[in-house]
Amino acid sequence: RVEGKNLVDANGKIVVLHGVMDTPNRYFNGWRWQQWKADYSESDIQPCLEYFSKQFSAITDKEQGAYCTVFRLHMDPCWTNDPTKKAENEADISAFSMARYRLYLQKLYIPLIKDAIAHGLYVIVRPPGVCPQDISVGDKYNRYLKAVWKAFAADEYIRQNSGIISIELANEPVRAHLSDGSNSDQALHDYFQPVVDEIRAQGFKGIIWVPGAGYQSQYQNYAKHPITDSEDNFSYAVHVYSGWYGNMTDKNCNHDTFIRNFKSQVPMVETKPIMVTEIDWSPEDPDKANEGHYNEWGQWTQPNLGSWATASTSKWGLAWKAVHDHFGNIGMTITHPQEYYDIDEYLKTGKVIPGFQNAKKHNLFEECCGYACMNWYKEWYMKQTDTGIEQKVNDAEVVATYYYNIAGVKVNKPEKGIYVVKQLLKDGKARSYKVCY
């Protein structure tokens, strides 16, 4: 839960989460679990679940160096849209079907969440699709978000596991307006506050992550008009890519400047935990020097080695790490698992190796986010667990031992699965650690 400027676990220990995001969409996963088909139906669920189960195993395989602790799940509209209707893009909700959403929430999304949790992962869930470029208080999209989250938050399993499952209200708002379309520094608050209230009205007590404007990079208006929450268990979800935050790039990567710019655009980093739910980087691809595209801000971007944003670890990447380490309360999920580890290699051999193996050809492998985050996630995980919370104690010091399942319910004797062991010690203290039977 959110406590002051940090996330804390059930023992009150500070937690910073690091992981990956993915979407159960065949195209975005390189057709790895199924080839192209015209639509998505119940017969497609099983291969999808099996594929994701392998991913969850890979990203949590500490013996092979993978130390993910969180997974961001996109409830992809490819399942929730009515296949007889045509949506123009991911921001077009005209094809959304509440009946399909309810069906696949039970048959696909919740099973994916359960499997991620069984692998020891916290789960952040985002709604189907992305925000339209312009949103106005009380508009169709605002009502859509309320309806989606009402159905989600009312689910009994979701409510019971709200200490592990958190909600990211929307993906990448760009410009927010008042109901009459006018601009106001109160628009963001007025747009998302009712969505927060709707979720709490269903009895969901877990963390709610609130997005900002500018593709989730501008939060200054929340400093003037903060979200309020009956559970006091919310914070902000942010996106970070090179070229953002005062045009921080490989050419402009002063650490102190990045820290200052980030604090200026996300001022609540000093008072609340921040979750960066999208971030990635890889350098320009020397083989594609003549190709390119314009990014969100109209900046020319040369093709890179397989990420959304273009940058190098030794320049922009280390500047980002300086921001992360300076504040100490910023978690992150990389934009796709293949940018963290080599999915094809894992499916073939069971080996977990960093993503962007293709960069070795140009001696740029260590400049990509896969290699960097495989190392950083481990480093950050070790720092967190070195405080003793997961260290076992001498049997002589233990007065009593209790077992809890991942839902936090006390059990007599663990069967197969992940459990939290709580040991009461002679000095009155308690120690907890996670075990897998």
Model regions and ranges:
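Short capping micro-motif at the N-terminus of alpha-helices
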Residues: 9, 16-18, 295, 413, ...
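C-terminal outer-membrane/trafficking sorting elements
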Residues: 388-437
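Short acidic-hydrophobic surface loop/beta-edge motif
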Residues: 5-8, 136, 421
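Non-catalytic accessory regions flanking glycosidase/transglycosidase catalytic cores in CAZymes
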Residues: 1-67, 83-91, 355-385
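An active-site-proximal structural segment forming one wall of the substrate-binding cleft
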Residues: 39-70, 75, 79-166, 187-198
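Extracellular glycoside hydrolase catalytic/binding regions
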Residues: 24, 28-31, 36-37, 41, ...
